[in-house]
Amino acid sequence: MFIIELIKGIILGVVEGLTEFAPVSSTGHMILVDDMWLKSSEFLGSQSAFTFKIVIQLGSVFAAAWVFRERFLEILHIGKHKHVEGQNDQQRRSKPRRLNLLHVLVGMVPAGILGLLFDDFIEEHLFSVPTVMIGLFVGAIYMIIADKYSVKVKNPQTVDQINYFQAFVIGISQAVAMWPGFSRSGSTISTGVLMKLNHKAASDFTFIMAVPIMLAASGLSLLKHYQDIQIADIPFYILGFLAAFTVGLIAIKTFLHLINKIKLIPFAIYRIVLVIFIAILYFGFGIGKGI
């Protein structure tokens, strides 16, 4: 039985690593894979299972931090500066890197404030299968709209051409994504595209902006709930964290390599299919009714 539980921990870590930064909603996938199928709360207990999800989310966040480590060092004025994306040699000599710490802070403010105000309400009232399905579907439609608009934009901007207004608007959309299932990256990448960034630039800024917020939020949650971790469950937590970190590294790098080519519509279609599948399980078979 212990081996089976460890395998379940690895599976959940893999799912977290694949979905946390992809525009498909990690919350929706956790409901499907854990709450409807693996049910970690049955062998860990509800509080310990909640803490486990915090730990594997940290695995994904550390993966994103590693992928963007050079960017973060540059933003903090540590380390060597690379060429600015979207600028020629003359512009590079006359202009500093456009993306800086203030851009990130401006983008973080809306979600940070609303998170402090409404986090408990959202956790208590909005984490249910029907609300997550709504978030998945509405988010998919928003992504399709963004992709259709992006076709009309000539010479979309790179991440180093972003301005403070764009950063703030993208930050507001990150706050909207507090609705479970909407997807932080789906919302912010779509908004970035609507603000005339290219898909890769919108994705870069999304991940850079998300890392400090998620580190702070997950870190605070872990401080509140670390006492729920049982010594016997530590191998479960370690394997889940390592799985989320490793798979997260691969998923983030692959996503950033492909996003300018494939755009958002394939992810939107996948989300709609996922909604249909969850709806069949929930309304047709009653699976997840107690969530």
UniProtKB/Swiss-Prot annotation:
GO function terms (MF aspect): undecaprenyl-diphosphatase activity
Annotated family: Belongs to the UppP family.
Subcellular location: Cell membrane
Reactions catalysed, as given in the entry: di-trans,octa-cis-undecaprenyl diphosphate + H2O = di-trans,octa-cis-undecaprenyl phosphate + phosphate + H(+)
Keyword Ligase: no
GO cellular component, one term: plasma membrane
HAMAP family attached to this UniProt entry: Undec_diphosphatase
Keyword Metal-binding carried by entry: no
Xref: NCBIfam families: PRK00281.1-4, undec_PP_bacA
Keywords: Antibiotic resistance, Cell membrane, Cell shape, Cell wall biogenesis/degradation, Hydrolase, Membrane, Peptidoglycan synthesis, Transmembrane, Transmembrane helix
Note: Bacitracin is thought to be involved in the inhibition of peptidoglycan synthesis by sequestering undecaprenyl diphosphate, thereby reducing the pool of lipid carrier available.
EC number: 3.6.1.27
The protein's name in its UniProt record: Undecaprenyl-diphosphatase
Upper lineage: Bacteria, Bacillati, Bacillota, Bacilli, Bacillales
Record's bilayer topology term: Multi-pass membrane protein
One matching Pfam family: BacA
Protein function: Catalyzes the dephosphorylation of undecaprenyl diphosphate (UPP). Confers resistance to bacitracin.
Chief site of localization: membrane
Transmembrane segments: 1-21, 48-68, 102-122, 126-146, 162-182, 203-223, 231-251, 267-287
GO biological process: cell wall organization; peptidoglycan biosynthetic process; regulation of cell shape; response to antibiotic
